[in-house]
Every structure is written in C-alpha cells, then in structure tokens.
Amino acid sequence: MTHEEHHAAKSLGVGKAIAVLTSGGDAQGMNAAVRAVVRVGIYTGARVFFVHEGYQGLVDGGDNIREATWESVSMMLQLGGTVIGSARCKDFREREGRLRAAHNLVKRGITNLCVIGGDGSLTGADTFRSEWGDLLNDLQKAGKITAEEANKSSYLNIVGLVGSIDNDFCGTDMTIGTDSALHRIIEIVDAITTTAQSHQRTFVLEVMGRHCGYLALVTSLSCGADWVFIPECPPDDAWEEHLCRRLSETRTRGSRLNIIIVAEGAIDKNGQLITSENIKDLVVKRLGYDTRVTVLGHVQRGGTPSAFDRILGSRMGVEAVMALLEGTPDTPACVVSLSGNQAVRLPLMECVQVTKDVTKAMNEKRFDEAMKLRGRSFMNNWEVYKLLAHVRPPVTKSGSYTVAVMNVGAPTAGMNAAVRSTVRIGLIQGNRVLVVHDGFEGLAKGQIEEAGWSYVGGWTGQGGSKLGTKRTLPKKSFEQISANITKFNIQGLVIIGGFEAYTGGLELMEGRKQYDELCIPFVVIPATVSNNVPGSDFSVGADTALNTICMTCDRIKQSAAGTKRRVFIIETMGGYCGYLATMAGLAAGADAAYIFEEPFTIRDLQVNVEHLVQKMKTTVKRGLVLRNEKCNENYTTDFIFNLYSEEGKGIFDSRKNVLGHMQQGGSPTPLDRNFATKMGAKAMNWMSGKIKESYRNGRIFANTPDSGCVLGMRKRALVFQPVTELKEQTDFEHRIPKEQWWLKLRPILKILAKYEIDLDTSEHAHLEHITRKRSGEATI
C-alpha cells in the first residue's frame, strides 16, 4: 500500500459529518462502538455528532444532537449500557417524525448515519434512507430548507451495527452485548450452583432473549445444564416424562443438583408458552424435588462489558466509519457484522429479511427451517448440546476403542471443559476413555485411570487443570510411554494444551520411526492464555486471561483518574506472543502496547512519552501502557518505568504493575467454556473416525501425516491440520506462529489512542451477500 493510500484515510472524512445514535434496548459494548465511531471519524477529518436518546433525539433535535470531541468519549469503554441514551420511539415510525428528523440532519449538514441497535432500529434506518429524497422535496416545498441545502444533502448513507443481548440478528455470529449478557448469566448460574448443591435443589432459571434461544442454549452448554427450553426447537410431546426421567437419572448418578434453563419465549409443539412456574410445578408434583425458580431479568443487560464486546464494538465502529465514508448513492445500506473472526459488510435489508423469515417460520411452526436460518453457529451449539445432554451413556462399550485424554503445558481456564466434553462424547460413542495425570510425565509413569460419566461432572465451570499438567516433553521418555500405550491399550490420544502440546505432537510424529506403539492417531486442542499455538486463531483460555487483564486495567485506570497526572505501566503474560497485550490494550483503552512482533526503538518510547505529555494538557490526565513480558530483553518493564519517571518529571508520575499468574487463574468465561466444549466434541468425533480408518489386521497403525493434527479455528471454520504441515509456519525460537491475524488490529489501537499515524485503519470488510455467507463455513 502506498503512502498516498495510507494518507487517504486521514482525509477521507474532510467536509463530511457523521451522526451516531443508539436505539432500542441497551447492550453492553455500545459505548465502545460509539467511542470508536467518534474517534475514527475525527481521525479521518469528519465532524461527528452524538444523537442523544436514540431516534427520539433525532426527531426532537435541539440539544439532543451535539458535536462530539475526542475527550467526550474518554472513560466510556468500561461502562455498560449506552452513555448517549436510548429510547423506543413511536414518532419515528410516522412519516411526520421522519420529516422532522431529516430537517434536523440537513440543517447540520449531516449525511452519514451510524445506527447501533436491534433489527427494529435498523429497519427504521433503511426506511428513512429510502424516503430521503421525498422527505427533502417536502421540506423544500414547505420552505424549511433551501435548494442549496437540499443539494448538499442529496443522499443519506446508513450503516448499522447490531447491538442486542439476544443475538437474534441473522448475518452476524455475535451481536454487541451478547457475550457480556452471557457473563452475567454464568456468574449467576455459578453462584446458584453452590447453594443448589448444599440443599440438593433443582433450579429453574429463566433467561432473556425474546423469541431467540441463543442465550439459553449457550448458557446450557456453558454450565452443563440438565435441560434447556428454546423457542426454535420445542420439546417432543412427551417431554414431561423425558424431563423427569432425565432429572432422576442425574440424581441416581450422584449429582446433588439439577439445573433447567428456560428461554423467556419457550413454547411447545403447539405454540403454547412453557413457563418457569409450569416446569417447577411439574418437577415438584412428579418427583417431589425441592425446586426454586429464578428469573434473571434486567441483570443480563447490566454491568461492565466483557473484553470480547469491547473489542467487537471497537472493530465494528472503525469499520462502520469506513463503510460510511466510502459509501456512494448506489451503495446499499449495510450492516457491519462478524463472521468467525472476520469483519464483513452485509446488505442491511437482506439481514433484516432473513431475521423476519425466522419469526415467520416459527409462527408457522416450521421449526427445522427456523433453526437453519439462525445460521451454522446456532446449529452447531444445538448439535453439541443434544449430544452431551440428551443421550444416556451406553452400558456396554460397543465402539470399544480406547482413547486417552491429557493436559500439557501451563494450566489455563477452559481445559476442564474440554476434558469433560471429550470424555463424555467418547463414552456416548461407546469408547473406553482414560485420563492421564500430569501430561507426558504421567503418561510415562503410568498415572492413568479410566473415566466414567460422573468423573467429569461439574467440570465445565472450574478453572485450572484438574488432571494436572506439566511442560515436560515426551522425547526423553519414549521407551516408558510406548510401554504404557501397550499396557493400557491406548489407541488414540487427545492432547489439550499450549505450545508444548504442539511440540509434543511433533516429537510423537518423529518417534513413530523408532516406536510402532506411537503410530496411533492424536489431536491437539490449543489451550493456553498466550494464544500462540500454530494452526489456530484462538486458544482455549485466552479469553479468560483477557478479561482478567481488562478488569485489572479498569481498576488501575480508576486509581490513575483519581490521582491525576499518573501513568501506569502494566506487564502482561504471553511469552513472546503479543496477543494479550494488544487485545487488552484495545479493550482497556491503552495509550500503547509494546510487543515482540512489532519491534520498537528508544525513539518509539520517546514518542510515547511526548504523546503522554500532550495528553496531560487535556482533560484526560492519566495514562495506561501495556508491555508484553518478552517484548524486548533490554527495554524491560523496569527500564520503561524508569524512563517514563525521568522524562515525565513535573508533568506526570509513573507506577508499574506486573500482573503475573493471576492471568492463568479464575473461572472460565462463557466464550472459553463454549469453545472448549465444542473443540472437545469435534476432536473426539474426528478421533473415532481416524481410529476406524487406521484399524488393520486387528491393530491400530497410523503413520500418515493426517493422523496427527492440531484442531484450530481458522477465520470461519474449525479445521484439522497435520502438525508436520504447521512446522513451516512456526517460529520455534520464540514459540509463536510466523503469521498472526490480530496484528492487523494494531493500527486501530494507535488511532483510538490519538496517534497521528499514516496507517491503514480498516479491516477492508467486503460487501458480501447473506446467502453466500450462509453456505460458508462459519462453525463457531
């Protein structure tokens, strides 16, 4: 990309004006999107206006439409809800209201509108756009605007961002606010679990979501619920008997509690509502269990946005500004959405149409079609949930393969969830599943035992590694490992862990030349806070670590804001991989994030200090700088702290914080629980097929490259890649992949921190069509 093209982004908005509004129900992460729209808009040279109180503010005008400044969006990232206010507006539904709204925009020269809201808000925006020409004609005839004003504002560009906790909008894998709502729900479920266990109770939890079962479904996966009721898939006619049998079976197997999740719009096959109270009465009457109902209500909309929602809001906000400024009269109104980890632009009305089709299909009781229209991600969640929850473990081991599961590397949140789903899917398939304690060391020493269904009960929400994990690699113990593979008749190996799990896999591949016993299929599930395993864009555990860092940064920023003129330097984990520092920097609103992948010099440090000196002259008198632990062996945290302290004398003082091992701990986030559960299920399904494929002359013999893989999330799909193929893509000295997708987000971090850089800011999301996306491979 040429310097001229880089520079073009900085002048793209000159002479243009953008208005941003939040409409409909609030959602955590909306503020991150508003902040990004304002700052990137200003960066491109445009004027940006807040529209307070949603469409109502657009109709009423006056003080509701105010110009935004860089500082006016400071300290917004960590706040829930929407700072600029939202309202459900009747006036805008009438043409008269839209006429007043058009008048208010034209008078201010605003021709670009960014709407953050649900499907209703976005449909309203599209109607407004299609009527724009007629509205201007009417205003001109009435003498409210001049011909020149009408000419200047001849067309209106509209871009939508989907902000809704329900995740009910077709065309995007995740809407802004969904992940945070799941955080609130899971916090409550975890808290309820302890009291339910104490009293051997059954809890019926009602979650929000209107006519969409996404929150209920993912909650069930993330907490291992006994049953879930969602509107898209009503239960069979005899569901009362099935439910009661399921609950009593769980108790018979030794469980002290039952959790039932109900979506607020849950219905039966005849379209009749299934309420929490109905279910409670049923359980009490038929089983006599002590049963309680908890309706979660508006708690789900509140609280601090999760790291995921802050990053999603920021990325979508940046892309929205670019889509608006690149728009022409012929460009359709679009929605910026997420597919896998890719930002994409989709025609707004195509998405709205599919969303309406879901409602129509459900009203007409075409539930299978409604499920399909929700998309691949929803379908996958449902398939995995059904597998794990609605099957009785077989009494006999019909498949009778023996698969061992182990953890390797450093402990990380979500490992236990992956072990649980691997073990249970294995048992459902009729296999014998063994668990190995303490990684490859335990495999060599024979620390191996058989796992039954109840062995992994309640593991989903527990942090760390219950099996125990070591960084030891297998090479030195091939003799003992081979002996134990024979002794325990291990025919497949599921390795859950970080970079050591991957290098261990490579060593097993090498060892096959000498030891026939090692010729068994194995699969590596990446699980590490560092997110540095080649072959996967995400690792289990990284999201939990990111949220821990974020929470700490919020508290530190609060302290700095109270003290005034203070800069905090925070050291994050990650080895040589800068993922945590970069993403936490984006989520916490850091001024800089130093990482190994982007070499920096003393001049860069000087620029950062000068930038902070300038910042202290504004109303925002605090600074936050993140440093990855191994970003530079000479520019250490102490060095940077000393440099900042010296250079900032009299202007600001500095403090440093090394976060350390708290980043590995804690209860896994909903995203990590869900991701780990799906990865475990996918890995075990692959394993059964691979063992069958490798079965020759009464024994397993697998020596092809594709019998040893890493299961990874790549853009929009879960893929199995042979470890030998990934070798070329790995920087072994620094334990990182040679190419990392998140590096393209670094410019956004710098622009949002007000650096005058000539860098390409957009992710260049192309306009796709929803039909093409549906047939794509979005699997998570």
UniProtKB/Swiss-Prot annotation:
Recorded GO MF terms: 6-phosphofructokinase activity; ATP binding; fructose-6-phosphate binding; metal ion binding
**In this chain, where does the modification N6-(2-hydroxyisobutyryl)lysine occur?**
K557
The residues annotated as the active site are: D166 (proton acceptor)
Question: Where do the segments described as C-terminal regulatory PFK domain 2 lie?
Answer: 402-780
Which of the residues bear the PTM Phosphoserine?
A: S377, S667, S775
* Residues involved in ATP binding: G25, R88, C89, G118, D119, G120, S121
The UniProt keyword set, sorted, is:
Acetylation, Allosteric enzyme, ATP-binding, Cytoplasm, Glycolysis, Glycoprotein, Hydroxylation, Kinase, Magnesium, Metal-binding, Nucleotide-binding, Phosphoprotein, Transferase
Glycan-carrying positions: S530
Its primary localisation, in coarse terms, equals: cytoplasm
UniProt: substrate binding residues: S164, I165, D166, R201, M208, G209, R210, E264, R292, H298, V299, Q300, R301
What this protein catalyses is: beta-D-fructose 6-phosphate + ATP = beta-D-fructose 1,6-bisphosphate + ADP + H(+)
Regions crossing the membrane: none
Question: Could you tell me which residues carry N-acetylthreonine?
Answer: T2
Q: What does the entry list as the binding residues for beta-D-fructose 2,6-bisphosphate? A: 471, 528-532, 566, 573-575, 629, 655, 661-664, 735
Query: Which top EC class applies here?
Result: transferase
Which coenzymes or cofactors are required? Mg(2+)
Domain of life here?
Eukaryota
Chain residues that bind Mg(2+): D119
The region called Interdomain linker is annotated at 391-401
According to the record, the protein's activity is controlled as follows: Allosterically activated by ADP, AMP, or fructose 2,6-bisphosphate, and allosterically inhibited by ATP or citrate.
Enzyme Commission number: 2.7.1.11
* Its job: Catalyzes the phosphorylation of D-fructose 6-phosphate to fructose 1,6-bisphosphate by ATP, the first committing step of glycolysis.
Q: Which family does it belong to?
A: Belongs to the phosphofructokinase type A (PFKA) family. ATP-dependent PFK group I subfamily. Eukaryotic two domain clade 'E' sub-subfamily.
- According to UniProt, the name of this protein is ATP-dependent 6-phosphofructokinase, muscle type
Q: What is this organism's lineage?
A: Eukaryota, Metazoa, Chordata, Craniata, Vertebrata
Q: Which gene encodes it?
A: PFKM
